[in-house]
C-alpha cells in the first residue's frame, strides 16, 4: 500500500494543473524544489537524488516540486542507449511511500516522444504513481486560494498570467537566481539549481531548495526559501531569504535577507 502523509492528496483537472489539497487547519506547506536531474547523462547525480530523498525523510518533508529535464535528451550520448533511457529512469528514480513529486516536463523530456513516440507524461503517470506530471514546459499547482507555477524552460508563463500566481519556479537555467518581477506583474521568480553536474556558469553547482510556505486565511503569508548544496552525503544551507506577501496587491513585496554567504568551493572547510 502507498500512503502519503500527512494529508497530501491531489486530483488532476483537464488542463496543466493539479490541486494539492491541504488540511483546512494546516497553514504551512513544506517542500523541496529540484530541477534538471538529466538522468541517463554521464553527468547525472543519482547519489544526490537519493540524498534529496533522505533529506526529505529526515526533515519530515512529503512534497517535491520538480522543474523538469528529469532525463537527458535521448539524442545525447549517455550511460545507457537512447531506447533504454526511459526504462533506466523508471528503474533508478528513488521511491518512498511518503513522498509525492509534482513534475513539469522540460525540453529534454520531450525527446522520447519525438523519436520513439514514448510520452513520458503518460509513462510516469502509469508506472511511477508517485511522480505526478502536470504537463510539458509549464504547469500549475493550486493550493488553498493560491497557485504555484513550475516552468521549463524559462518563459513568462501564460498560466501565471491567467492565475496571477505570486510564485514561479523555473528549471532550465542550471543556476540559482531569484528574479523579482514585482514592479511589472508582481510575482517572485526563482531559477532552481541543477541536481546534476551540467552547469551553465562557473559559479553554479548542484543543489536543492527547501521552502516553507505559510498561509493566512488561505492566502500566501510568507515564503522561507533556503538554498542548499551537497556536502558529507547530505545538504547544507548556504543562503536563506524570507519573502512576505501580505501586502502584495497594494505594496511591493518585502524581502528580508537573512544570510548570503559566498560559496566558492565544494571542498570541506
Features from the language model and the residues they span:
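Acidic, histidine-bearing metal-coordination/catalytic regions of metal-dependent phosphoesterases
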Residues: 1-35, 268
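Residue-level marker for buried hydrophobic side chains located in beta-strands
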Residues: 31-33, 63-66, 103, 149, ...
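Active-site glycine-centered loops adjacent to acidic/histidine catalytic or metal-binding residues
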Residues: 36, 68-69, 106, 152, ...
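Conserved beta-sheet core of the metallophosphoesterase superfamily
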Residues: 147-149, 154-246, 265
